[in-house]
Regions:
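Secretory targeting and sorting signals
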Residues: 1-32
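N-terminal hydrophobic targeting/anchoring segments and the immediately downstream early-domain regions
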Residues: 29-353, 360-367, 371, 384-394, ...
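Short hydrophobic/aromatic-enriched beta-strand-loop microsegments
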Residues: 397-405
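Catalytic beta/alpha-barrel core
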Residues: 374-381
C-alpha cells in the first residue's frame, strides 16, 4: 500500500483538520445484469508456449477489497455489486454536496482539505476514476477483465488492514480489528469470484479464479484464465501490535493466526507495514510525510521511530526528519533514554537505520510461514529486519520470498534472486518503470528472468500518470496486445466515458494493458518479453516453496 496517502490521512487527523457502453446480452447466468464491455476483441491465449511455459503478465500487489478496510467508509465504490455497475460505481454519500466534505480526497488529490469534485459516477464519470483520485474505486471487475483479456494471468490480491487508521478516521461501518477486516475481505473476494462465475454460466466457469497452490494456478492459466492469489498486508497481523515496547501477541496467537489465514486461502504475507509492531521494525517514510507517519507510530505503539546513523554503503532505511541540530547534540542521551522506554522524534544527521529489526516473535512468524509454504513479502521491513529475514530464508534454502512493489533496499535484490525469489516494481509512470526494470534486471544472475509490477491499485496511492510527451509519440488505438497478439485492444469505454492512456494515464485498472503497450513502444521487445514471463517466473518461485 502506498505511503503518501496514509501519511496525509494521519497528518490531517493528527493536526485536527476535520473540517464502451453496456453489453446488451447478459451472460449465461439467469437474470444477470448488463455489465460494461472491455474494448478487447479476440480469444485470450490459453495453453502454453512452445517451450511449455505459461504466458502472461503479473500484478504482484493490488487491493481489490480495500473498500472494506479502515472501517469501510474511506474508499468509495466496489469492484462488483449484485445490482450491477450503477450500484457499484457511485461516490460516497459523505462526499456530497459537490465533493466539499471529501477532505481526504481533496487533500490527497489537490494538497488541501478544501475543494470540490463532480461526484457523479456511472455512467458519466466526469471526475473519477483518475490516476490521482485515491478514494474512488480503481478495480471494477470489468476493468480487471480488460487487463486479463489483454494478457494478465496472475493477480495478487493483498488483503489490507491498519487499526490505527481505522480508529482515527471518524466514519466507519466495520470493525477496526485487523483480523476481522482480513476475514471480511477474503469473503468478499470469494463472493466476487462467484459473481463472475454466475455471469459465465455457473461455478468454475468464470475467468477470475482464486488459487491456493502453484499447480492450481498453472492449471487455471493454461485454461486461459486469471489466477488470483490472496496475500495479506496488515500493520498488526494476529493482533501483534506494540504497547510501549511490549508485544501484544504470543507465539500461540501467531500459530493460530497463520493457520486461520492459510485456511482462508492466503499464501503470501507481510509481517509489518508502516508502523513498528511486535514482529519487526519498518522501513521509514521520508521528509514531511515521514514526520506525520512517525506520529502515527507513536499513536499506535506509544513510541516514536528509533533510528541511528549508519553506513550509506550498506543496506539502510529511508532518512527521516527532523535530523541534525538537536538530533546530533542529543544523540547520546537519546540513545540512553531508549532503554527506559523514552523516545523523541529527533534524529542524527546522515543515513538512517531503524534500530528495530526482526524480533523473536517475527522470526517465529517467518518460520511458521515457511512451514506452511507461504511466500514471505520482504517489502516494508527495516533494513535490519530484512537482513535477518533473508538470513533465515538462506539457512532454510527457501525460495518463497518476494519484493512486490519497490519497498526494500535494492542492495537486497541479489539475495532475493539468489534464493530463487522474485522482484516486481511499483507501478510507476512508464519511463520510471522502465528504469527500474533495467536496474533490477542488471542485478539478476542471468538465468531465467521474468518481471512484474505491483500496481498497488486501491492502495490509496497514485496509478501511473500520463507519459510526458505522449502527444508527440502516442500509443495508437486500436492496437494488438504485445503480450497476447491474438487480441486487439481499443480505447476503454464504460457507460458514456471513454479513457485514453495518452491523456489520462492509468485512470483505472482497465488501462494497464495500454500502459504496458506504451512501455513496449518505448523500450522495445525486451521489456515485453520479460513482462510476458512474469506469471511463469512467479509460479516457478512459488513452486519451489512447496517441494
Amino acid at each position: 500500500m502506498s505511503r503518501r496517502p496514509l501519511v496525509l490521512l494521519l497528518g490531517v487527523l493528527l493536526a485536527g483538520v476535520m473540517s464502451a457502453g453496456l453489453v446488451g446480452v447478459p451472460a449465461a447466468g439467469a437474470g444477470a445484469v448488463p455489465e460494461p464491455s472491455t474494448g478487447v476483441t479476440g480469444v485470450p491465449f490459453a495453453g502454453t508456449t512452445p517451450s511449455g511455459e505459461v504466458r502472461g503478465y503479473l500484478d504482484a500487489h493490488s487491493h481489490l477489497m480495500s473498500y472494506e478496510a479502515f472501517g469501510g467508509k474511506l474508499m468509495c465504490g466496489k469492484p462488483f455489486d449484485e445490482k450491477g455497475v450503477a450500484a457499484a460505481l457511485r461516490d460516497c454519500p459523505d462526499h456530497e454536496p459537490h465533493g466539499v466534505p471529501a477532505w481526504f480526497e481533496n487533500f490527497t488529490r489537490h494538497g488541501t482539505p478544501f475543494g470540490t469534485h463532480d461526484t457523479r459516477g456511472y455512467p458519466d464519470f466526469p471526475s473519477w476514476p483518475a490516476a490521482n483520485s485515491l478514494t474512488h474505486q480503481q478495480t471494477y471487475h470489468a476493468w480487471i477483465e480488460r487487463s486479463w483479456r489483454a494478457g494478465q494471468r496472475v493477480l495478487v490480491n493483498q488483503l489490507v488492514a491498519n487499526r490505527v487508521l481505522c480508529e482515527i478516521y471518524p466514519l466507519k461501518k466495520n470493525a477496526c480489528d485487523e483480523m476481522d477486516s482480513l476475514r471480511l475481505q477474503a469473503k468478499r473476494t470469494r463472493e466476487m469470484e462467484a459473481y463472475i462465475d454466475r455471469r459465465a454460466g455457473g461455478p468454475g466457469k468464470g475467468w477470475f479464479r482464486i488459487v491456493e497452490s502453484p499447480e492450481q494456478a498453472r492449471q487455471v492459466i493454461q485454461q486461459g484464465k486469471l489466477a488470483v492469489v490472496l496475500g495479506v498486508e496488515a500493520s498488526e497481523p494476529f493482533g501483534c501490535g506494540l504497547s510501549n515496547g511490549a508485544p501484544r501477541c504470543t507465539e500461540a496467537q501467531i500459530d493460530k493466526g497463520l493457520d486461520e489465514l492459510h485456511a482462508l486461502g492466503v499464501r503470501s504475507m507481510f509481517v509489518c507495514h508502516k508502523f513498528d509492531n511486535a514482529l519487526c521494525g519498518v522501513r521509514f517514510d521520508s521528509d514531511a510525510l515521514g514526520v506525520i507517519l512517525n506520529l502515527g507510530n507513536f499513536v499506535g505503539t506509544g513510541r516514536f521511530w528509533q533510528a541511528d546513523a549508519c553506513s550509506a554503503d550498506a543496506p539502510h532505511d529511508n532518512p527521516i526528519a527532523p535530523a541534525g541540530g538537536l538530533g546530533d547534540l542529543l544523540a547520546g542521551p537519546l540513545r540512553d533514554l531508549r532503554g527506559h522506554g523514552i523516545t523523541a522524534p529527533l534524529y542524527p544527521s546522515g543515513t538512517h537505520c531503524n534500530v528495530n529489526g526482526l524480533t523473536p516473535l517475527g522470526e517465529h512468524a517467518i518460520k511458521g510461514m515457511m512451514q506452511r509454504k507461504m511466500i514471505v513479502e520482504l517489502d516494508h521491513m527495516s533494513a535490519k529486519a530484512a537482513d535477518r529475514a533473508l538470513t533465515l530464508l538462506e539457512e532454510a534454502r527457501y525460495s518463497g520470498v518476494m519484493s512486490s512493489h519497490s519497498w526494500t533496499d535494492e542492495r537486497y535484490v541479489r539475495r532475493v534472486y539468489g534464493l530463487g525469489g522474485m522482484v516486481a516494481s511499483y507501478g510507476h509512470g512508464a519511463e520510471a518503470f522502465i528504469a527500474t526494470w533495467r536496474r533490477t534486471k542488471a542485478l539478476h544472475d542471468g538465468g531465467s528472468f521474468g518481471f512484474g509490477y505491483g500496481l498497488d491499485a486501491n492502495g490509496m496511492g497514485p496509478l501511473p500518470p500520463r507519459r510526458a510527451g505522449a502527444e508527440k509519440n502516442p500509443l495508437r488505438y486500436p492496437y494488438r496486445s504485445p503480450i497476447d497478439p491474438g487480441v486487439t485492444v481499443d480505447r476503454q469505454r464504460t457507460g458514456n466515458r471513454t479513457w485514453d492512456v495518452n491523456t489520462e494515464g492509468v485512470a483505472n485498472y482497465g488501462l494497464v494493458p495500454d500502459w504496458i503497450a506504451d512501455m513496449g513502444n518505448l523500450a522495445g521487445e525486451p521489456i515485453i518479453t520479460d513482462l510476458s514471463r512474469g506469471a511463469e517466473e512467479y509460479l516457478r518461485m512459488w513452486g519451489r516453496t512447496t517441494r
